[in-house]
Amino acid sequence: MKCPFCGHSNTQVLDTRMSEDGDAVRRRRRCEACDRRFTTYERIELFFPAIVKKNGSRVDYSRAKLKDSMRLALRKRPVSAEAIDEAITRIEEKLLALGQKEIPSSQVGELVMRELRKLDKIAYIRFASVYRSFEDVAEFSDVLAEVTSGNSKR
């Protein structure tokens, strides 16, 4: 491992541990040339599928973008940041389990809607109204009826 301070290529590992959340190996290192210490983290690199938008363009998957859209739907709702992160992790696990290089944005939207429905019905309706581009009040009423009756058409 190259020293970030002097660029020397020989470093000694002083300590190795799992990170608190268990998703990385934390290593404390010392440079043999300048004697400075630094920490490195070793993580598994995951490759998410590219997202194919409705217009046919492709964009890289973005956890931040997904989180922003869920936060917007959950704005001023009693849902913790931890619950949002857990929902996003479940969505990501499903995306990785598909094993595909590309997936349509509509499929991601449906996964988001399922998770929002579990978290908060109001947020689900907010997201659905934008995501499904309701044309009239009848479509909105259908989703409201679906949520209040506890049935799911999708």
From Swiss-Prot:
Cofactor: binding details: Binds 1 zinc ion.
> Has keyword Glycosyltransferase?
no
List the unnamed ZnF regions, as residue ranges: 3-34
Q: Where is the ATP-cone domain?
A: 49-139
Domain of life, per the record?
Bacteria
Q: Which InterPro entries match?
A: ATP-cone_dom (IPR005144), NrdR-like_N (IPR055173), RNR_NrdR-like (IPR003796)
Q: Provide the GO biological process annotations.
A: negative regulation of DNA-templated transcription
Asked whether the keyword Nucleotide-binding is assigned, the reply is: yes
Q: Which GO terms describe its molecular function?
A: ATP binding; DNA binding; zinc ion binding
A Pfam cross-reference name: ATP-cone
> What cofactor does this protein call for?
Zn(2+)
Q: Which UniProt keywords apply?
A: ATP-binding, DNA-binding, Metal-binding, Nucleotide-binding, Repressor, Transcription, Transcription regulation, Zinc, Zinc-finger
Record's family? Belongs to the NrdR family.
Q: Which PANTHER family match?
A: TRANSCRIPTIONAL REPRESSOR NRDR
Q: What does it do?
A: Negatively regulates transcription of bacterial ribonucleotide reductase nrd genes and operons by binding to NrdR-boxes.
According to UniProt, the name of this protein is: Transcriptional repressor NrdR
Organism, as annotated: Cupriavidus pinatubonensis (strain JMP 134 / LMG 1197) (Cupriavidus necator (strain JMP 134))
